[in-house]
UniProtKB/Swiss-Prot annotation:
The keyword Lyase applies. It comes from the Bacteria. The gene is hemE. Its main location: cytoplasm. HAMAP family: URO_D (MF_00218). The lineage of its organism: Bacteria, Pseudomonadati, Pseudomonadota, Betaproteobacteria, Burkholderiales. One of its GO terms (molecular function) is uroporphyrinogen decarboxylase activity. It comes from Bordetella pertussis (strain Tohama I / ATCC BAA-589 / NCTC 13251). This is Uroporphyrinogen decarboxylase.
Length: 358
């Protein structure tokens, strides 16, 4: 596939801690339910899976936030649970309930059935990547993504989201051998999955370790970070003559920043509970940092959003050699006012230009 030259590479350069004229911004879940146009497209698709498995619809919703806001990156519209769905677990999104699996993995016989899926069963994702790259026409880079081996294992064992992670932790403490087997398969599948996204045209990739923070110290390193590192070490790191940066985001992982930064990634995502300046000192500019505005700030109105954006940028400190990508500390809420997002993007671009020029 012939691709257009990249017109705005500020996001990629920031991830590699190269000089940039301003701090780039994109938002986790930027293509989502807070946008009326997303909801209209989802209604046409008939269901979440109908949306995610149709490359044209996936492309349409991926591009919707870029039509509204001058964001510095697009992120593939998909879901972290596509990989276990391809393993045969039967993913479904029930209205008002979120994702659930028809065939959760809870005992030895379930684990014995697991295998790395044929990537051809995920072709709709890679077709979407190619379609989005074509339609972006070099406007901004495209981010591919996957869930971390631990996070998707949580969903696989629980069968849905969880408040206490009782089932996955029962396996962790009672049959760690089974959990390690699941994680080995997940890591191998995720490596293949992200590399296929890169081959299809993703210019950066992100690993969402959404539930790493529910683990105790010591267990995080053993059951989450070790398998995240395994994925990162197996990724294609150069394509189209450029490095393909890797971002790792562990929600609730603030106490392990130094260890996460050493896993081989180019950038570490931060949730809103972490002091950005302190995080930068802890990782000593060895990696870029992404984040970390509290998503609930968007409900405080334009003035509060602009003030908090400036505070976040100031917290990072002198731009120097440190790379910073502005983002929320978690995904944007479906109830966020779209007009306030405009205020956020404008403030980040305007205020950070002055910081970088100074």
């Amino acid at each position: 596939m012939s691709v257009a030259p990249l017109k705005n590479d500020v996001f990629l350069r920031a991830l590699l801690r190269e000089p940039v004229p301003y701090t780039p911004i994109w938002l986790m879940r930027q293509a989502g339910r807070y946008l009326p146009e997303y909801n209209a497209t989802r209604a046409r698709a008939g269901s979440f899976m109908g949306l995610a498995q149709n490359p044209d619809y996936a492309c349409e919703v991926t591009l919707q936030p870029l039509a509204r806001y001058p964001l510095d990156a697009a992120i593939l519209f998909s879901d972290i649970l596509t990989v276990p769905h391809a393993m045969g677990l039967g993913l479904d999104f029930a209205p008002g309930e979120g994702p659930r699996f028809a065939h959760p993995v809870r005992d030895e016989s379930d684990v014995a059935k697991l295998a790395v899926p044929d990537m051809d069963s995920l072709r709709y994702v890679f077709d979407a990547v190619r379609t989005i790259r074509r339609e972006l026409d070099g406007r901004v880079p495209l981010i591919g993504f996957a869930g971390s081996p631990w996070t998707i294992a949580c969903y696989m064992a629980e069968g849905r989201g969880s408040d206490d992670y009782r089932l996955i932790k029962s396996m962790l403490y009672g049959r760690p051998d089974l959990l390690h087997r699941i994680l080995e398969i997940n890591a191998e599948a995720t490596r293949h999955y992200l590399n296929a996204q890169i081959d299809a045209g993703a210019q950066a990739v992100m690993l969402f370790d959404s539930w790493g923070g529910v683990l105790a110290d010591g267990l995080f390193q053993q059951f989450s970070l070790a398998y995240t590192r395994r994925v990162v070490e197996g990724l294609t790191r150069e394509r189209e003559g450029r490095r393909v940066p890797v971002i790792v985001f562990t929600k609730g992982g603030g106490q392990w920043l130094e260890e996460i930064a050493a896993c081989g990634c180019d950038a570490v995502g931060l949730d809103w509970t972490v002091n950005l300046g302190a995080a930068r000192r802890r990782v000593t500019d060895a990696v870029a940092l992404q984040g970390n505005l509290d998503p609930m700030t968007l409900f405080g109105g334009a003035q509060a959003v602009r003030a908090e954006a400036r505070r976040t940028l100031d917290a990072f400190g002198p731009v120097g050699k440190g790379g910073h990508v502005f983002n929320l500390g978690h995904g944007i809420s479906q109830y966020s006012p779209p007009e306030v997002v405009s205020e956020l993007v404008d403030e980040v671009h305007t205020y950070s230009r002055a910081l970088h020029a100074g």
